């Protein structure tokens, strides 16, 4: 009789960071979900910040926003894109959040005068957080951030070590990701870093049950046998995670090696045979699109670190999947647009996207990109700050308010067409205080937005402090700006568009957070469809996209 008690899969990493633990965890979740199991995923981050909301995109990359307003690690985006699990703030815990909870309990006297220590109080809080997020899942996949050996990770590793004894040996497995480097001078793949990484993990008290080795080449059976022997792991539980052209190929690759079957066997989980046809179809459209390619310009501030736009990049890829076309992303530094001009940097692209962001640097370049898209009739999509920059550009270029700006960038502008939300005026703290999470948006019948969504009211995720100033709403509409989406409760502007443009749309929310490869977001599907039409029009006019 196979057990139906909740199973826990703990994923750790060694040797170096950025091995792809998040993608490996998401792939495991996808495979087990395809076998009929209910899965959820949790990310444990060792840093002291309560959440990544106030961290620089250059340090942390994207901040992924959940439905309930959690500002979380970008790996939660992988989890949502690869599985049907809906993430919340309970799916991401940091050292800062854990320690804050422990200290608050101590202040309330919940420890009954005891000396508060890492063991058991901090580790108990970590375990409690894991159980809280587990809910009714058949399988809980817990990714521990950082690298084995990092001092910050020790409380988390101790907590997951204890979990095996708390919930039963048969209900826990440890999956360890390592690196198998190839030394060109020797012509060999070296296993020693993996051996030492496992040794470090065993010193903490964790014996990995599975090894997933990152590599850029095929690993022969003899090498896997060697790794198994030195690391005390069953040969059948040694797998490789090779370099793949698309991250969506990874579940198929791990299934080909039998990882999901082996996990089900070791954990004694009943599961059906996997159905991976839709993954295979996705890969076909990514690798062999039937309709060629389009070139999309992303005009932003963080273009030198594209991880800052991870969900955005993926959502554009999903739009390509929906239209069976390859999407080539052309990242353009908005400050360079200021210096060199939009005509020089954006000529020949099939569509232009201005994403969210913070700070004044490069904003005039974004406004110039909007102007170029509006005047040249190039498909345009503005997200969050991108919508605000579109309103500023329209106010300057169409309304004739040459000094129009956002109060975020010019506190003394005579025409603050974008202003601080009323609820934000008295806010002093930075962390977790923006308008965060899912809010309703009522769509204007007959608008492009209504046509794309096919709904009267939608729910989308937000992360902002500034909004279009309703004092200018009537003037903007009279001049031709269509306000196609509004928050029904506060009457905030949520979506804008231009009726006399092939595709000009802006949204105050972040639709990229809800896009999946199997369910591309309608705004991205429509945007790429418009880019295709622009490409074909350029070709007919003798213009060639680079």
Curated annotation (Swiss-Prot):
CDD domains: CTPS_N, GATase1_CTP_Synthase. GO terms for biological process: 'de novo' CTP biosynthetic process; pyrimidine nucleobase biosynthetic process. This is CTP synthase. Pfam families: CTP_synth_N (PF06418), GATase (PF00117). ATP binds at residues 18-23, 75. The gene is pyrG. CTP binds at residues 17, 150-152, 190-195, 226. Residues 295-537 form the Glutamine amidotransferase type-1 domain. Signal peptide: none annotated. NCBIfam families: PRK05380.1 (NF003792), PyrG (TIGR00337). InterPro entries: Class_I_gatase-like, CTP_synthase, CTP_synthase_N, GATASE, GATase1_CTP_Synthase, P-loop_NTPase. Catalyzes the ATP-dependent amination of UTP to CTP with either L-glutamine or ammonia as the source of nitrogen. Regulates intracellular CTP levels through interactions with the four ribonucleotide triphosphates. Gene3D superfamilies: 3.40.50.880, P-loop containing nucleotide triphosphate hydrolases. Its EC number is 6.3.4.2. GO terms for molecular function: ATP binding; CTP synthase activity; glutaminase activity; identical protein binding; metal ion binding. The active site is at 384 (nucleophile), 510, 512. It comes from Myxococcus xanthus (strain DK1622).
């Amino acid at each position: 009789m196979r057990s139906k008690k909740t199973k826990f899969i703990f994923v750790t990493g060694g040797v170096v960071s950025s091995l792809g633990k998040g993608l490996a965890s998401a792939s495991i979740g996808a495979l087990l979900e395809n076998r009929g199991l209910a899965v959820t995923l949790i990310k444990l981050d060792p840093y002291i910040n309560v959440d990544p909301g106030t961290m620089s995109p250059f340090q942390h990359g994207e901040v992924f926003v959940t439905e309930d307003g959690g500002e979380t690690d970008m790996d939660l985006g992988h989890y949502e894109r690869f599985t049907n699990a809906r993430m919340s703030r309970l799916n991401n815990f940091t050292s800062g959040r854990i320690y804050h909870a422990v200290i608050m309990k101590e202040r309330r006297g919940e420890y009954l005068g005891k000396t508060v220590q890492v063991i058991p109080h901090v580790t108990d809080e970590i375990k409690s957080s894991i159980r809280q997020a587990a809910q009714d899942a058949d399988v809980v996949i817990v990714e521990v951030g950082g690298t084995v050996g990092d001092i910050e990770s020790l409380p988390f590793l101790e907590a997951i070590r204890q979990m095996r004894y708390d919930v039963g040996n048969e209900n826990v497995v440890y999956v360890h990701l390592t690196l198998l480097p190839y030394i060109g001078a020797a012509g060999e793949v070296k296993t020693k870093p993996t051996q030492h990484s496992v040794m470090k993990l065993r010193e903490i008290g964790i014996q990995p049950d599975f090894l997933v080795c990152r590599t850029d080449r095929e690993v022969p059976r003899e090498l896997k046998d060697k790794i198994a022997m030195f690391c005390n792991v069953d040969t059948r539980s040694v797998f490789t995670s090779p370099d793949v052209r698309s991250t969506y190929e990874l579940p198929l690759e791990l299934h080909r090696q039998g990882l999901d079957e082996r996990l089900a066997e070791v954990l004694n989980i009943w599961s059906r045979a996997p159905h991976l046809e839709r993954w295979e179809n996705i890969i076909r459209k990514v690798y062999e699109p039937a309709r060629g390619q389009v070139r999309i310009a992303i005009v932003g501030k963080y273009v030198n670190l594209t991880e800052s736009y991870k969900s955005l990049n993926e959502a554009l890829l999903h739009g390509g999947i929906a239209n069976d076309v390859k999407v080539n992303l052309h990242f353009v530094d908005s400050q360079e647009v200021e210096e060199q001009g939009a005509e020089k940097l954006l000529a020949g692209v099939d569509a232009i996207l201005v994403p969210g962001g913070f700070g004044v640097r490069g904003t005039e370049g974004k406004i110039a990109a909007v102007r170029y898209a509006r005047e040249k009739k190039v498909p345009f999509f503005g997200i969050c700050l991108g919508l605000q920059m579109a309103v500023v550009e329209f106010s300057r270029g169409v309304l004739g308010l040459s000094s129009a700006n956002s109060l975020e960038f010019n506190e003394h502008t005579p025409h603050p067409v974008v202003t601080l939300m009323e609820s934000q005026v008295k806010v002093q703290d930075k962390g977790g205080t923006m308008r965060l999470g899912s809010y309703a948006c009522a769509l204007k019948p007959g608008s492009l937005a209504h046509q794309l969504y096919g709904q009267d009211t939608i729910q989308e995720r937000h992360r902002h402090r500034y909004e279009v100033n309703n004092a200018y709403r009537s003037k903007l509409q009279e001049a031709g700006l269509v306000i196609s989406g509004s928050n029904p409760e506060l009457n905030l502007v949520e979506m804008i568009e231009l009726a006399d443009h092939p595709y000009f749309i802006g949204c105050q929310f972040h639709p990229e957070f809800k896009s999946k490869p199997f369910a591309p977001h309608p705004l991205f599907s429509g945007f790429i469809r418009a880019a295709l039409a622009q490409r074909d029009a350029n070709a007919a006019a003798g213009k060639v996209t680079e």
